[in-house]
C-alpha cells in the first residue's frame, strides 16, 4: 500500500509539473498578436527594435518552447536610481531588474537554462561587428511565445523595465530552438 501512495504521489507531482512546464494552448492566434503589438506600439522604436521582426517571430509560432539567447553589456558606471534618486552602479539596477524578471519568467513556465559572465574576447568571429565588451549572457527558456507576451505584459516586468534600461549599455537577443544539446530537460530530470 505504501508503494502505491509513493508512486501515486510521484505521478501526481510529475503531472502537475508537466501542466506548468508544457504549453497546452497551441500557437498564437492572429488577434492575440495584433492586440499585443498594438499595446506595445511606440516601445520598439525607442530601443531601435523592429515591430516587423517581432510580428514575423510571433506569426511563425509553432506552439513549442524556445530559448532566448541574451548578450548584455552592463552599465558599470554610476547612474541615478529611478526609485531613490541616489547614484548606484548600473549593474546593480540590472540585478534588481533580474529579481523582478525571474519570478515572472517562472510564473509563465520559463526558467534560465544558463547564465554566465564573459571571460574573454571573441575567439572566432568574422564579418561581424566588433565586440562591444559584453558582460554577461543568458539562455532563458520560454514555454511558448504566448508566455513571452504574458511576461512582457506582467506589471512586475513593466515596473522593472527602467532598471533594465539604466543597467544595460547594449543588448543583443534572439530566439532559438534546440537542435542538438547535452543539456537534459527538466521533463527528464524531474
Residue ranges, per PLM feature:
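Short amphipathic alpha-helices within nucleic acid-binding modules
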Residues: 80, 144-157
Amino acid at each position: 500500500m505504501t508503494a502505491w501512495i509513493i508512486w501515486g504521489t510521484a505521478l501526481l507531482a510529475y503531472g502537475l509539473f508537466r501542466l506548468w512546464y508544457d504549453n497546452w494552448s497551441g500557437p498564437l492566434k492572429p488577434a492575440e498578436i495584433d492586440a499585443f503589438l498594438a499595446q506595445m506600439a511606440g516601445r520598439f522604436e525607442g530601443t531601435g527594435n523592429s515591430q516587423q521582426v517581432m510580428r514575423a517571430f510571433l506569426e511563425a509560432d509553432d506552439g513549442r518552447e524556445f530559448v532566448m539567447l541574451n548578450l548584455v553589456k552592463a552599465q558599470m558606471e554610476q547612474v541615478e536610481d529611478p526609485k531613490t534618486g541616489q547614484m548606484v552602479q548600473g549593474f546593480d539596477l540590472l540585478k534588481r531588474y533580474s529579481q523582478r524578471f525571474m519570478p515572472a519568467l517562472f510564473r509563465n513556465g520559463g526558467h534560465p537554462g544558463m547564465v554566465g559572465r564573459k571571460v574573454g574576447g571573441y575567439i572566432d568571429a568574422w564579418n561581424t561587428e566588433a565586440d562591444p565588451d559584453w558582460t554577461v549572457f543568458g539562455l532563458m527558456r520560454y514555454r511558448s511565445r504566448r508566455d513571452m507576451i504574458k511576461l512582457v505584459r506582467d506589471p512586475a516586468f513593466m515596473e522593472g523595465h527602467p532598471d533594465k534600461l539604466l543597467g544595460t549599455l547594449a543588448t543583443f537577443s534572439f530566439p532559438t530552438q534546440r537542435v542538438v544539446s547535452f543539456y537534459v530537460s527538466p521533463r527528464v530530470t524531474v
